[in-house]
């Protein structure tokens, strides 16, 4: 029978693992988003990934409202909660939309598209920043890869976090009709409109 000291040791190891993982992730975070901020209660709820929390979170609002800063903070909280719950360090993929769409192009020289697609499908958390900043390729190739990524994550209930200036239902001109339809399903109950003053007037957004 496990003793109390065994439980304490396991808890201590898990705490050390969590703190080390969060510190490492913080070092990978862009400098202006490393400062802690208070996140909206619904974003904090998503980060806990409890049974009542939405699997996916879509942060929207005006330019400069703080979507990206909120997203990085919520991702750190999600990371800590995941390790507390499972004891395992998750794999988190963070991408700016413009870089992601370029990487998914069939003529990409930096990535094997099929390998990258599978990598993004299987990550424990996929965070895409500023979705409205990018546009799909006219050939439809990027649309197909995006659909494969989002569909696989949707059917396996793998968390996604997206920041965007427009609502999921208004993303057709960005990602195409098919992907837009999947996004609307994925983020049902997980759309959060952030409101307030433009933080870029005197701070990071």
What is each of the regions a protein language model found here?
Residues 51, 84-87, 118-121, 151-156, ...:
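Conserved catalytic network of the ASCE P-loop NTPase/AAA+ motor domain
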Residues 73, 77:
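Active-site signature of alpha/beta-hydrolase-fold catalytic machinery across serine-
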Residues 54-72:
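Walker A/P-loop nucleotide-binding motif
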Residues 1-48, 191, 196, 200-205:
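A short, basic N-terminal segment
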Residues 79-122, 139-140:
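Short glycine-rich substrate-engagement loop in P-loop NTPases that contacts/grips substrate
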């Amino acid at each position: 029978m496990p003793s109390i000291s065994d439980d304490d040791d396991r808890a201590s190891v898990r705490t050390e693992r969590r703190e080390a993982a969060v510190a490492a992730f913080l070092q990978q975070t862009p400098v202006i988003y490393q400062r802690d901020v208070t996140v909206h209660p619904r974003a904090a709820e998503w980060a806990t990934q409890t049974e009542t929390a939405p699997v996916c979170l879509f942060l929207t609002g005006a330019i400069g409202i703080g979507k990206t800063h909120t997203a990085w903070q919520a991702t750190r909280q999600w990371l800590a909660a995941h390790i507390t719950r499972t004891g395992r360090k998750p794999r988190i993929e963070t991408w700016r939309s413009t870089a992601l769409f370029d990487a998914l192009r069939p003529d990409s020289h930096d990535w094997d598209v099929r390998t990258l697609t599978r990598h993004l499908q299987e990550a424990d958390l996929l965070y895409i920043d500023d979705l409205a900043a990018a546009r799909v390729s006219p050939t439809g190739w990027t649309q197909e890869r995006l659909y494969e990524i989002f569909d696989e994550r949707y059917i396996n209930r793998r968390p996604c976090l997206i920041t965007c200036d427009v609502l999921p239902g208004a993303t057709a001109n960005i990602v195409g009709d098919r992907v837009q339809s999947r996004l609307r399903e994925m983020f049902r109950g997980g759309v959060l409109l952030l409101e307030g003053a433009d933080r870029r007037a005197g701070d990071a957004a």
